[in-house]
Regions:
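Second-shell loop/turn segments in exported
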Residues: 133-137, 145-154
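Bacterial Sec-dependent N-terminal signal peptides
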Residues: 1-21
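A contiguous strand-loop segment
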Residues: 21-142, 163-196
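Aromatic- and Gly/Pro-rich donor/ligand-binding loops
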Residues: 160
């Protein structure tokens, strides 16, 4: 009897899981998988975040160096960087705007969705979409640029969340719903962004 009940619930679980996967959905393959584990959830007290990039995005990566910048320097914000073929490919990239640059930026791993900096601040990303009516077409930022700027400027998760929120409030967010996981050496957070 126990094996019949286990099989029944396993079958129900499998059917309900498959019902959520619809290859005909235009957003199928756009929702990455993110993983988070805080200190209390790991054997050695580590903090972990990871994500799979399940979309059709660039595969190259590059370690960007730490840098110092002049007081008058600006940071150029781009749209379209997810689909570049090399670090210098600007064919489908457009300038969205500029923001003031900070005096010093950290080294970070530049991937389709920038993922970690020299201070062990790490990020993962998952698209969860949402209705088109919630997309701010005039918003300057896409999620990958917000991640890039936070990794350049922040050494902990809370500061990254504050910075990203402030940039969205000031310049706008111009994409569908996103969930980013943000981890440092001590804690991990999940931040959801939609329609700003």
């Amino acid at each position: 009897m126990k094996s019949i009940v286990t099989t029944f619930f396993g079958l129900i679980f499998s059917i309900s899981l498959m019902a959520q996967v619809n290859p005909g959905d235009p957003w199928f393959g756009e929702s990455c998988t993110s993983i988070m584990a805080g200190k209390a959830a790991t054997v050695d007290g580590s903090v972990i975040t990871a994500h799979t990039c399940d979309g059709n995005y660039r595969t190259w990566l590059r370690m960007e160096k730490a840098a110092e910048h002049a007081d008058t320097a600006v940071y150029k914000v781009y749209k379209g960087t997810l689909h570049t073929e090399t670090p210098w490919d600007m064919r489908k990239v457009e300038l969205a705007g500029e923001i003031p640059q900070v005096a010093k930026t950290f080294a970070y791993l530049n991937t389709a969705y920038p993922s970690m900096n020299e201070k062990q601040l790490a990020m993962g990303e998952t698209t969860f979409v949402g209705p088109d009516t919630l997309v701010n077409k005039n918003g300057m930022f896409l999620i990958e640029e917000l991640q890039r700027i936070a990794l350049q400027r922040c050494d902990n998760a809370r500061d990254a969340i504050t910075l990203i929120g402030g940039l969205i409030e000031e310049y706008g967010y111009g994409d569908h719903g996103e969930c980013i996981t943000i981890a440092d050496k001590y804690e991990v957070w999940q931040m959801e962004i939609l329609g700003a």
